[in-house]
C-alpha cells in the first residue's frame, strides 16, 4: 500500500470551523472545546464565531505534542506554553 500525504494551505483569510480544526489535528471536537474552556485556545478576534486560523491549528498540534511527549495534563501544558510564549525555554 502506498501512503500519500496531503495538505492544505491556510491563507490569512481562510478559517477552519471547529470540526475541520479537530479533524486536521486528529482530535475530537470535544477535545478542542476543552482547550477553549481551559483557556488554552481562543479563536482570533477577527474570525467568525468558533473559527480558527493556521496559528490555532499549530497551537492545538503543539498542545497534543506536549501532552504526548511529557505525559502532561492540560494544566502542565498551560505552564509550558506560557514559558514558550515568553521565550523562556
Regions found by a protein language model. Name each.
Residues 2-25, 29-33, 37-89:
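Arg/Lys-rich, alpha-helical DNA-contact motif
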Amino acid at each position: 500500500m502506498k501512503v500519500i500525504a496531503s495538505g492544505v494551505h491556510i491563507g490569512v483569510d481562510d478559517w477552519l470551523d471547529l470540526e475541520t480544526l479537530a479533524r486536521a489535528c486528529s482530535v475530537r471536537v470535544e477535545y478542542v472545546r476543552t482547550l477553549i474552556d481551559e483557556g488554552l485556545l481562543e479563536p482570533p478576534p477577527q474570525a467568525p464565531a468558533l473559527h480558527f486560523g493556521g496559528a490555532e491549528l499549530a497551537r492545538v498540534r503543539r498542545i497534543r505534542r506536549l501532552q504526548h511527549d511529557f505525559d502532561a495534563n492540560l494544566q502542565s501544558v498551560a505552564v509550558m506554553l506560557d514559558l514558550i510564549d515568553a521565550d523562556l525555554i
